Curated annotation (Swiss-Prot):
GO terms for biological process: DNA replication; DNA synthesis involved in DNA repair; double-strand break repair; SOS response. It comes from Gloeothece citriformis (strain PCC 7424). Belongs to the RecF family. This is DNA replication and repair protein RecF. The RecF protein is involved in DNA metabolism; it is required for DNA replication and normal SOS inducibility. RecF binds preferentially to single-stranded, linear DNA. It also seems to bind ATP. ATP binds at residues 30-37. Gene3D superfamilies: P-loop containing nucleotide triphosphate hydrolases, RecF/RecN/SMC, N-terminal domain. It holds the Pfam family SMC_N. Transmembrane segments: none annotated.
C-alpha cells in the first residue's frame, strides 16, 4: 500500500495543508512543537481511528474551529481508496470511504494499515500494564477490524457491571436502614448473574484473540531481537491473562471466567468493581530469563521495543498481504547508531516510511538521496 496524499483542514495546528508523498521514504524535519507529530497522528487516525496521544476529538481540532478534517488518497493492490475523517468539537465524528459516509466505523478500519513507533513506545516495557494491553489491542484492530467491535462490547458490559456492583455495595452499606428493600438488593444480585455471563462471553473473545496474536508475533519478535542483540540475548513474551485457560475453545474459556467470577464474588461486591477479566491482563517481556520491566537496561529495552515494532510490520504484511506504512516519530534520536542502522536496513524500500526528526545528522547520505525531504515550521510544510 502507498499513501499518495494527505490533506489537513483545521487539524491540530494545521489550518490548511496538503502533502503529496513522492518517495517510498519521506523525512519531515523541523524544530519541536511545529506539527511534525501531528502529521503522523493524522495518518495513525486513518489507520486505527485512535490517537495514542489524546482520547477526545475536540483536542484534535484547531483552536477556534468547530470541525477538523483529514483526507487521504491511498493506493492498494486492488486500486485507489479515498479516506476521509471529520472530527467535531461537539458531536460524533464522520468517517468517509470513497466519498461515501459510512454508518459503521468498523467498515473504515483495515483500509490503511500503519505501525507507529514513537519515543513514547520506549515506555512499553516499563510502563503500566494498560499500555501493553493498548499496544496489543491496536495491533489486533489492524489485523482483524471486527476486534474493535469485540473490545467495545466488552468495555460496555464492564461499565454496566461496575455500575451494578457499585449500587450493590452501596445497598449493603445501607443495610442497617430498615426502609431499604431487601427485595431490591436481591433483584440486583440476580441481575448481576446475567452480567456475569455477558462478561464471560465478551471477555473470552478478547482474551482468546490476544493469546493468538501474541503466539504469532512472538517468533517474529524473537528473530528480530536476536539479530539486533547479536544473538547474545534471548527474548520471551508471556501473555498473563487475568483468567487462566488452557484450551482455545469458547465454552471452556467462558466457563473459566464464570468460575473465577464466583471465587471473587464477595471481593467484587465489597470493592464495588469488577476484578475479573481481560481489562486486568498483563504481558511480560523476559530477556535471558529475567523480567525486562525491572532489570532490563535502557539499551536492552530499546532493542526489545525495536524488535516488537519490526515484528508488527512483518505480521501485518503476512496477514494483510501488503506491507503497512511505518510512522517513525522522533525515535531515531532515541536509538544508538547500531540500532538506527538495524532499523533503517530493515525498512529499505519495502515499507513506505514517514520519519520526523529535528535534524538530518542521523541519516546516511544514501538514505537522504533516496528520500523525499520536507521541512515544517508553524504548521506549514514545504520542500526542504
Amino acid at each position: 500500500m502507498y499513501l499518495k496524499t494527505v490533506q489537513l483542514r483545521s487539524f491540530r495546528n494545521y489550518r490548511e495543508q496538503q502533502v503529496n508523498f513522492e518517495s517510498q521514504k519521506t523525512i519531515i524535519v523541523g524544530n519541536n512543537a511545529q506539527g511534525k507529530s501531528n502529521l503522523l497522528e493524522a495518518v495513525e487516525l486513518l489507520a486505527t481511528l485512535k490517537s495514542h496521544r489524546v482520547s477526545r476529538d475536540r483536542d484534535l481540532v484547531l483552536e477556534g474551529a468547530t470541525t477538523g478534517q483529514i483526507l487521504a488518497t491511498l493506493e492498494r493492490a486492488y486500486g485507489l481508496a479515498e479516506l476521509g475523517l471529520i472530527l467535531r468539537v461537539s458531536g460524533r465524528r464522520t468517517v468517509i470511504l470513497n466519498q461515501e459516509p459510512l454508518r459503521r466505523q468498523l467498515d473504515f478500519l483495515g483500509v490503511l494499515n500503519a505501525v507507529q513507533f514513537s519515543s513514547l513506545d520506549l515506555d512499553l516495557v516499563r510502563g503500566s500494564p494498560e499500555s501493553r494491553r493498548s499496544w496489543i489491542d491496536t495491533l489486533l484492530v489492524q489485523l482483524e477490524p471486527i476486534y474493535a467491535h469485540i473490545l467495545s462490547q466488552y468495555y460496555q458490559v464492564l461499565k454496566q457491571r461496575n455500575a451494578l456492583l457499585k449500587k450493590i455495595r452501596q445497598q449493603e452499606e445501607d443495610s442497617q436502614n430498615p426502609s431499604l428493600s431487601s427485595e431490591q438488593l436481591s433483584n440486583d444480585i440476580s441481575q448481576l448473574k446475567l452480567w456475569d455471563s455477558q462478561l464471560a462471553e465478551t471477555g473470552s473473545r478478547v482474551t482468546r484473540r490476544r493469546a493468538r496474536v501474541l503466539e504469532r508475533l512472538t517468533p517474529l519478535a524473537q528473530k528480530w531481537h536476536a539479530n539486533i542483540s547479536g544473538k547474545t540475548e534471548q527474548l520471551e513474551i508471556q501473555y498473563m491473562p487475568n483468567v487462566n485457560w488452557t484450551e482455545d475453545e469458547p465454552m471452556q474459556v467462558q466457563q473459566a471466567f464464570l468460575e473465577k467470577i464466583e471465587k471473587r464474588r464477595i471481593a467484587e461486591q465489597q470493592l464495588g468493581t469488577t476484578v475479573v477479566g481481560p481489562h486486568r491482563d498483563e504481558i511480560e517481556f523476559i530477556i535471558n530469563q529475567t523480567p525486562a520491566k525491572y532489570y532490563g537496561s535502557q539499551g536492552q529495552q530499546r532493542t526489545l521495543v525495536l524488535a516488537l515494532k519490526l515484528a508488527e510490520l512483518h505480521l501485518i504484511e503476512e496477514v494483510v498481504g501488503e506491507p503497512p506504512l511505518l510512522l517513525l516519530d522522533d525515535v531515531l534520536a532515541e536509538l544508538d547508531p547500531h540500532r538506527q542502522n538495524q532499523l533503517l536496513d530493515a525498512i529499505e524500500d519495502r515499507f513506505q516510511t514517514l520519519i520526523t526528526t529535528t535534524h538530518l545528522n542521523s541519516f546516511e547520505t544514501k538514505w537522504l538521496k533516496s528520500s523525499q525531504i520536507l521541512s515544517i515550521d508553524g504548521g506549514q510544510i514545504r520542500d526542504f
